[in-house]
């Protein structure tokens, strides 16, 4: 169970920054 929590946390730690960076990149591209 602990490994499941760790895996989920790791997934969020990776996905959230990627999502924020991707969103910022899209806004920049649309701005131009």
Swiss-Prot record:
InterPro entries for this protein: PetM_cyt_b6/f_cplx_su7 (IPR012595)
Record's keyword annotation contains Transmembrane: yes
Membrane disposition: Single-pass membrane protein
Keyword Transcription regulation listed: no
Biological-process GO terms, alphabetical: photosynthesis
Membrane-spanning residues: 9-27
Major localization class: membrane
Function: Component of the cytochrome b6-f complex, which mediates electron transfer between photosystem II (PSII) and photosystem I (PSI), cyclic electron flow around PSI, and state transitions.
Assembly and oligomerization: The 4 large subunits of the cytochrome b6-f complex are cytochrome b6, subunit IV (17 kDa polypeptide, PetD), cytochrome f and the Rieske protein, while the 4 small subunits are PetG, PetL, PetM and PetN. The complex functions as a dimer.
Family assignment from sequence similarity: Belongs to the PetM family.
Protein name per its UniProtKB record: Cytochrome b6-f complex subunit 7
Species this protein is from: Synechococcus sp. (strain RCC307)
